[in-house]
Design a protein with these regions (language model features):
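Anionic, Ser/Thr-rich low-complexity intrinsically disordered regions
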Residues: 1-94
Length: 94
């Protein structure tokens, strides 16, 4: 099995799991063993999926400015979490 073949179903599962609630505040229920590459791949794709929905929310022209600021900070934190996770996943290839 190639790495791509490993990733694809994990990414699809994370997206499908997110869409069970369609809620950026839904808890992550990662089904993979902690600290496994599968766990990190699922988590990364969950963060990506939530991030896409954050971006949709913040583009609402009627968003309250105070809510937008709170969301902007969540987006910034999510971006950093994603960057840290990508670096961790990259370490599997070193």
């Amino acid at each position: 099995m190639t790495f791509t073949e490993l990733c694809r179903p994990i990414f699809e599962q994370a997206i499908n799991d997110y869409h069970k609630t369609d809620n950026v505040d839904a808890p992550i229920n990662n089904p993979y063993p902690l600290k496994s590459i599968e766990y990190y791949l699922y988590l990364k794709n969950w963060i990506d999926t939530v991030q896409w929905h954050f971006e949709d929310i913040i583009r609402d022209p009627h968003i309250d400015p105070a809510e937008a600021l709170v969301l902007k900070r969540r987006i910034d934190k999510s971006n950093q979490d994603r960057t840290d996770l990508v670096e961790l996943i990259d370490s599997y290839f070193l």
